[in-house]
Amino acid sequence: GGPVEQVTTGERRLSSFSFSADGTVMAFTATDPVTPTELYVAMGDGATEQKATGFNDDWLGLVTLQPAERLTWTVEDGTEIEGWVIKPVGYGEGDSYPLILKIHGGPHSAYGNTFFPTFHVLSSAGFFVLYTNPRGSSGYGHDFMYATRGQWGILDKEDYLTGVDSALARYPAADSTRLGVSGGSYGGFMTNWLTATTDRFQAAVTSRSITNWESWYGTSDAQGLTEYEFMGTPWEQRDLYRRLSPISYVENVTAPTLIIHSEEDYRTPLG
């Protein structure tokens, strides 16, 4: 019944907590942008924390991982957006590197202080990696999470493009003429939306994506999502469903795009 007090420390993601019967010892998993998930044990007050597993120690001794650097920017209405940049392995001030924007799904989810293997694969291949939590993401309050209701692809597009500009300004070695974009599920929708409504990106990878919200509604298992977010069904909000569908602007796409899908993905199915 007392006040809540944080007893763990560090910029990382903790989960899967388990406590001893008397509450004096706890175990949990933890990860951060350069540390894959491991198991930790500590006293109930957070003291004497020790890493109990070393599943990834050998692998970490073989690879070079760049840290994630936090970046924030302000969009037109004054909202602050949070993101992170991972530099390319072997980064040098005088060199030039492509930049990839990675987009999370949801849209009501979020990136954070977590290990993302894909991002490090891209970094090791010589890419800057930008990932961010635009409006619509979770973790920043109700108004932020539902700011994009009825405007999917509109407000978050501004957040992403402003973030790309901010990253290019902060990292002169990032080449504005070699930009890529990639995401899955809602991130795939957003990838499609960006390549259909802007010419900023020279290449794209869209995974488990949505191009047509009307056909998605007829095949997905999550119709309630757009019934709320688009304020009705496709036959009640036909213009909105079509206006927010990337397929409506497909003739504008010029970026070479790799399309990846999953036959048994019932949330974002084929078709």
Residue ranges and their predicted role:
Residues 1-82, 86-95, 107-125, 166-169:
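Peripheral, non-catalytic segments that deliver or gate enzyme domains
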Residues 31, 102-106, 185, 262:
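Glycine-rich His-Gly loop
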Residues 102-105, 121, 131:
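Structural cue for short, hydrophobic secondary-structure segments
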Residues 124, 131-271:
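Active-site-proximal cap/loop segments of hydrolase catalytic domains
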